[in-house]
Amino acid sequence: VNFQTGNSKPVDVSVWAVIKCCSNHKTNISHVTEEKLSLLTGLDERTIRRSIKRLKDAGYLTVQTTIKEDADRGFIKRNTYYIAPIKTNYFFLDNSYFKRNYPAKIAGFLLLLKAICLNNTDTIQWSISQIAKSIGLSRNTITALIKECQQLGLIKPISNGYELTAGCFINSSVKKTNAGIYKELCEFCQSKGVTPPNWDKRAMSVLLT
């Protein structure tokens, strides 16, 4: 969310997500081609290159370029992407996200919205102005993108904000626990606009005894 690139930001986030998806998840290294990125995002290769440069300049990617000569194809440029590891403040995506063919700006915007949801939920308890300030886009841009997401069935307004309805996010911490008390605790926190605490086995053992 702190990645500041103006109105190109959602597109850059989408490109980053596809590079991450096409990487080795243990090494965070990707050899995906610009041609493949273009195919997967619907963006032309020139736009892909510009996006990669912004991601590189912002420190989200390290790019190593090699050029090899091929007898039939001439000189071939190939990038290797080293993705900066993220150890905190992350969420999981279902692979179905990458198969839905959303426009890149919508795909990236959806990820930005998820990043400001209450922990382990698809709920945003902010106004459009607050969302714009948090994400770093203009209010008019946020309004237009939210409208487009609503038309695609990816988000719906609720009494105090918005609910993501895309169905491609995995709220793992809640799903991994069967403790009714923990779920009730999370729901209570969310109703009060408070971020639920992380699952703590020792603390829950006290509550459950």
Regions found by a protein language model. Give the residues of each.
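Electropositive, intrinsically flexible nucleic-acid-contacting patches
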Residues: 1-209
